[in-house]
Amino acid sequence: MVPGPHGGGARALGSRSILASPLYRDMKDKLNREVKHREDWRPFCPSLPIEDYRTYFEHGTESDFMILAYPVRAECRDAIPGVVHVDGTARPQTVRADANPKFHALLKAFGRLSGHPVLINTSFNVQGEPIVCTPADAYRCFRNTDLDALVLGDYLLLKDDQLQRAAQREDYQKQFELD
């Protein structure tokens, strides 16, 4: 997901983000190994609509910047295991509709489909590289990692489609062999 202006700092707050379902326990490992290329112990943060915060967290308050860790409600830990740290906490980002309407709407839509309006949200980069800045950066990272899809503004690119098109392009270009 690469909508809007580039944010500052080390956190991806809905722009230049890699988003994934937190519903699978192994999603954290998959993202760390196959996408981010970093240590397996490193956790991911949940983004959720501010109005759903108390459903998942007993303590704390709104957290726009993924700075503080709070205990995840015991009854929710198995529902969103991809964002729960080993100590039962998570470092949430609360999203307000007035501050980030598209990201808020995406979280709500995911909630309607999955029952949980929560997504793993991590910076759109791999270990040792800065967060993507341009569409070309985003496309390069997408092509060279195990990401399934890339959203650039109003465009959706699917990895399988991109691979198929690359193969078709190679076949097409073979007809123009040099003499």
Task: Walk through the language-model features, giving the residues of each.
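Flexible beta->alpha loop and helix N-cap segments adjacent to enzyme active/binding sites
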Residues: 1-179
